[in-house]
Regions:
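Beta-lactamase-like hydrolase cores
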Residues: 10-54, 278
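Structured C-terminal helix/loop/strand segments within mature extracytoplasmic catalytic/sensor domains
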Residues: 13-24, 132-134, 184-224, 229-294
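Acidic helix-start/capping segments at beta-turn-to-alpha-helix junctions
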Residues: 42, 81-98, 133-134, 155-160, ...
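Soluble periplasmic/extracytoplasmic beta-strand elements of cell-envelope proteins
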Residues: 36-40, 49, 65, 86, ...
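Bacterial N-terminal signal peptides
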Residues: 1-7
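Active-site SXXK
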Residues: 45, 57-85, 250
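Conserved catalytic neighborhood of penicillin-recognizing serine enzymes
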Residues: 92-127, 135, 171, 175
Length: 294
């Protein structure tokens, strides 16, 4: 249970990352499921992980790779973010998002579709973007960044018709990655090296609009976080850039969760909230940022 609240927490000295590592490992070990994570101090250089090179299902977290690929193609003049995409009835898929409920024939820019893909994790919008850029290009972009385990397998809810890797798709679902690779992708975004400083800044601004506050950020108030979540029956994932006293990338993956209830306070979501809180307390928040102590 989250109780006490700490405002503007500032460590008296350099963050004790060894202690934080032990704390996160203890939380992960007590969880009824498989937990992998990676933490990176972008500015200070400290980094540590648990199951960091193990492959995990991403659920909707893989949409970050789609966003990066889209902006990379725009950066190189192969598409424009203002290019129109038209919503057809055949494009609509269920799950998260709003486009499913809007009228067929609606036209929006690919930029707006990508915004919905991140802010609302809109599945239909994601497929519109993937139609524009192709799944194969996401693999090529991830390879160019050295992220060879980070893959989009198929369009959302259309595995049977669009899978580019049938066996991996059946094993991991929509996408796969490792904690270290996804942490590296967010580190590159923070450093302006994923696409370009301007494009990366724009993507981080989009990621800050993420509406899902039930995982890593659930114990934080007035703390800037650029992140993306993912959820499936036995999967919860969240990865993002935390703007603390230093910029910190935090990625947590849970799989094979015993508690598969679709409620706010299921075990993996509570776990991830505690892990996010521990990181924020260790590195210290700024301004009016507060953390509810586990």
């Amino acid at each position: 249970m989250l109780t006490a609240c700490f405002a503007g927490t500032v460590p008296a000295q350099r963050p004790d990352t060894a202690r934080l590592h032990r704390t996160l490992d203890s939380l992960a070990a007590a969880h009824h499921g498989v937990v992998g994570y990676a933490v990176r101090d972008v500015d200070g250089g400290a980094r540590f992980s648990r199951r960091g090179d193990e492959t995990f299902p991403t659920a909707s977290l893989i949409k970050v790779a789609v966003l990066v690929t889209l902006y990379d193609l725009a950066e190189h003049g192969q598409i424009s973010l203002d290019d129109p995409v038209t919503l057809l009835s055949i494009d609509k898929v269920g799950g998260s998002g709003v486009l499913y409920n809007l009228h067929s024939g609606l036209t929006l820019s690919v930029r707006d579709a990508s915004q919905l893909m991140i802010q609302l994790s809109d599945n239909t919008a994601t497929n519109l973007v993937l139609e524009k850029i192709s799944i194969g290009r996401t693999a090529a972009k991830m390879d160019s960044l050295g992220l060879r385990s980070t893959r989009v397998h198929h369009q959302v809810m259309l595995r049977q018709y669009t899978s580019v890797a049938r066996d991996s798709s059946e094993k991991y679902g929509l996408g796969k990655t490792t904690p270290n690779e996804m942490a590296q992708l967010f580190t590159l975004l923070a450093q302006g090296k994923a696409v370009s400083p301007k494009a990366d800044s724009a993507m981080l601004a989009v990621l800050e609009t993420n509406d899902d506050s039930e995982l890593l950020v659930r114990a934080l108030s007035n703390v800037r976080v650029a992140h993306k979540t993912g959820a499936d029956d036995d999967v919860r994932t969240d990865c993002g850039l935390f703007y603390l006293k230093t910029r910190v990338v935090v990625c947590v993956f849970t799989n094979k969760n015993a508690d598969q209830r679709w409620i706010v306070d299921n075990e993996p979501q509570r776990l991830m909230g505690r892990m996010g809180a521990e990181v924020a307390m260790a590195f210290g928040t700024t301004g009016k940022g507060t953390v509810e102590k586990p």
